[in-house]
Amino acid sequence: AIVQNRVIENPQTLATAIKIGNPASWKLAVNAANESNGFIDCVTDDEILEAYKMLTREEGVFAEPASAASLAGVIKTYKAGKLKKGDVVVSVLTGNGLKDPDNAIKICNAPIKVDNNIEEIRKAIGI
């Protein structure tokens, strides 16, 4: 809504916590972006899922998709070449993944099953 500068009647996203077509803090968000020399952009659900998986895989952080959206924006900005050395970037992750377990269940890999045998366990984990 803010990026398009219009109210969105029926927003669609897997990030349910930010599925708001008319944000109550619209002016505050725009002011914060302006005062910090920042900007507000949008990301796709695919970009959110990429960041969501990366947080879990690389950092061990289980964030909800709405929180991962901020990192998705950083990744998008980086890939577009809009970040330069020395830039200060803040990505806030406030929501725990347990707020939205359905998305985690949909994208996680099936558990690995092995026999109750130390050699089978070593083989499964690659040691």
What do these predicted ranges mean?
Residues 72-127:
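Phosphate-binding loop/pocket of nucleotide- and phosphate-handling active sites
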Residues 18, 22-24, 47, 67-69, ...:
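Glycine-rich beta-alpha junction loops
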Residues 49-79, 87-89:
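Substrate-binding/catalytic subdomain of NAD(P)-dependent oxidoreductase enzymes
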Residues 1-62, 106-127:
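Active-site/ligand-binding loops adjacent to catalytic centers
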